[in-house]
Structure formats: C-alpha cells, structure tokens
Amino acid sequence: MDRLDASIKSYPHAEGIEAIMTQTDMTPLQRLAKVLQLGTPSNYRNHTYINGESLYFPTGRVYGGQVIAQSLMAASRTVAPSRLPNSIHGYFISAGDIRQDLLFDVENLRDGRSFSARRVNVTQAQGSILTAIASFQEHDQEGIEFADPMPENIPDPDSLTSAKQLMEPYAEQSPFAKYYAEKSPFDIAM
C-alpha cells in the first residue's frame, strides 16, 4: 500500500480550483487532449500505475465522463496496439477532487488470442473513486453487431441551439453557465 500512497499526490498543476479554472494558455479542447494523455506508466507485477490530472468542473469534483475516458486510455496503454476497445463498464465509488491527481491502477486480467481484459481502479488520497473493466479485441476480427436504425425526421444538429449559446447571457451570474459558455471542451446541441 505504501507504493500507492507514494504515487498519490496533491494536484501539482495549479494552486487551487481558481487557478485551474483560469488556465488560458490552452483552448478547452487542448486541455482535454492533455488530460487524456496521462502520465508515464510504471509497472509492478501484473499492474501498471499511471498518474492523471483533472479538467476544471464548477463543482470542484472530477467529471465522471472524464475519469471513464482516462480509464479507457490507461487500460489501452497495456494492450497490443492492434487491439481496440470492445467494451467498458464503470462503477463510481465516490466523488473525486479536481485538486488531486488521479492514480490509475491497471490490472492485466487476461490476454487471449483475440481479446484482452483489464481492470482499472482509480484512486485519490481518500480512496477509490472508480472501478472499471475494459475489454479489447483484435481490430481485424469482426463479431456480431447490434444497432438500432437511425431515427427519421430528427433535426440536423447544426440547426439546434448550443449550450454555449444558451449559457453565454448568464456567464457572469453562474459558475455553471460560465463553464459551459467558456471552459467546456464540449458544446451540447439542444
């Protein structure tokens, strides 16, 4: 356990939430790409440990979609490049703090001829925040696919009002509005 505790450290990239929020040297999309790159992996037995940081979110908590994406990225670093994500299942244990680094503990469950399976446990100083299991499959092997047909008579996404457009008038009145108007790497059409 000492090895895990030594790897968990306070958020080294900023002095508090305000500094994270006011990072202006990168666009929101560039910040997202940087967060998804994660740190340098270190190996111990059949585990790989990788540090990651968080994007700003107005609550001060780690956004769940971010940590799921980072878990998939961490797991993908431990499989052959020819294996692509097949599935991921995640279970949120507790809220994460954006001021602390995330530690991704990737356990190699199995490497078969066609599939690889990984378990990812994401921790911070207070303990586990997410546990996920990811499966990867050789890219040239096709399996059974299921998909519903695309619905008809739905509006074109570009014709819809974006979250950014809706939130801009309220950006100075609400941290959430400011986030969606200026800081979010995603723009949601409604």
Question: At which residue positions do the language-model features occur?
Answer:
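Terminal targeting signals and extreme-terminal segments of soluble enzymes
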Residues: 4, 8-190
